[in-house]
Each structure stands twice: as structure tokens, then as C-alpha cells.
Amino acid sequence: QWGREETQHGDALARWVKLADPTFDFEKTFAAFRAGYTPPHFEGSAGSVRGSRRGELIARCVVESGTTSYYSALRDATVEPVLKQVVSHIAGDEMRHWKLFYDLQQAQPELSFWRKLKIAAGRLGEAEDDELAYAYYCANTPIERIGIDPYDRKACAKAYETRLLRVWRPQHLQRAIGMVAVAIGMKPRGWIARGASKLIWTAVKFKTRHAMKAEARAAGRGGVPMARAA
């Protein structure tokens, strides 16, 4: 069920993109992304990179925490009614997926708190790799120019981040932090989670200002295209 719903999410968003911009070839763009990006932990490893099944499920909870927050932010920010409905349904699905993985991990052998924290922090850190930046590059580069126009990871990451931070609000961050906290055995509104939310939100506001300035400079130089968000 989880896998089918994730596929449906992609199909629904692809359909909306085609209606919003008929010139955008989603299939070719997605194929280019798949051809150009492979998660580092998929290379040469047939086993669990988290060390255990519970570790894998914690990592999945982290992912679902982020996607729930992300689609909730899009839902609250957009005024386009079809997109609002689509991302609202997706946000609800992602929350249920988080609950599924959380329930499944409870049946697995327990890990120490520090081990769970390390797994969660490691999965959060993977969001800083090429995945999102390269997705932005593929989505914003003419299909015939992908692989020809240079891929500037740093510029693409900043451009993507700028769009994300424009729609993110404190309540979205608090939800994500709370869900991650529960996944590793912490209280979602405990002092650690609250402190982390405040600290991260302060960093978010700083990065938003910095990213918007960087975007303006890039646009002025005719650099990274800014028309679409990945």
C-alpha cells in the first residue's frame, strides 16, 4: 500500500505539472534525473546501511517527517485549488506512512538512544547531498541541455532551498521535529524538541535571507534558472 501510494503521489504531481506547464516533459526530466543520480548508499551495498531493520525504519520515519512537513507547507502556501487539494492528500498519506514505519519499528529489537539519534541525524544529513540539488538542476534545465549545461551543485542547492524556506513556517518545522523526536523515543514537545525547533528556526530565518540574496545575484548574472521548483 505504501509503495503504491508513493507512486500515486508522483503521478498526481506530474499530472498537475503538465496542466500547469504543458511544455514541461516530466517523463524525460525524471529519466534524466534517475540516470544522473544514485544515492551513495545504494552503490555496492546489498545490506542495511543503518545496521539493523529498526534503524532502517527510523530512517524512513525521518523521511516521512520531512515530507509531511514539506507538503503541509505547500498546502498552506498555495492558492491554486487543485494543487492545494493534491498536496493536502499527500501530506495526509505521508503522515500515515510515518505511523506505519513507527509501528513496525516497535516490533524490532531496541537500540540505544544515542544510536537512534545518530541514525536520525545521519538521514537528515543525507538531504544535503546531491539528490535535491540535482533534481532542481534537471527540473530547471531544458531537457536537451541536461548534461551539457554545467551542474553547479552549490547554486542549485541554494535555489531549491530558497523556495522551500519561503513556504516553511514555524508550525511546519515543529511538526517535523516532533515526529522525528517520537521516532527516536523522545517527547515531541519536550524541552529538547522545543529547543531544537527554536534553534533551527533561527537558522532557517538566517538562511532564508542569505539564500534570497544569493538567488538575486545568480539571476542578475543569468545563472541558475529560477522558473520552476524541483
Predicted features, each with a name:
Residues 1-230:
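Non-heme di-metal
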